Amino acid sequence: MALKKASLACAVCGSRNYSIKISGNLKPTRLEVNKFCKHCGKYTTHRETR
């Protein structure tokens, strides 16, 4: 199956800072990673948005 695009949105301010490619089959849980948010100016949890 082809890769699909998804975004990682900051849990604090909601801005979509990163884009990723995920496998075609959707999982029930969404990816959560700690990344730097340029709008907040600190490391925050970023969650996958579809």
Swiss-Prot record:
Keywords: Ribonucleoprotein, Ribosomal protein. It comes from Streptococcus pneumoniae serotype 4 (strain ATCC BAA-334 / TIGR4). GO terms for biological process: translation. Belongs to the bacterial ribosomal protein bL33 family. This is Large ribosomal subunit protein bL33B. It holds the Pfam family Ribosomal_L33. Gene3D superfamilies: Ribosomal protein L33 (2.20.28.120). GO terms for cellular component: cytoplasm; ribonucleoprotein complex; ribosome. The gene is rpmG2. InterPro entries: Ribosomal_bL33, Ribosomal_bL33_sf, Ribosomal_zn-bd. NCBIfam families: PRK00504.1 (NF001764), rpmG_bact (TIGR01023). GO terms for molecular function: structural constituent of ribosome.
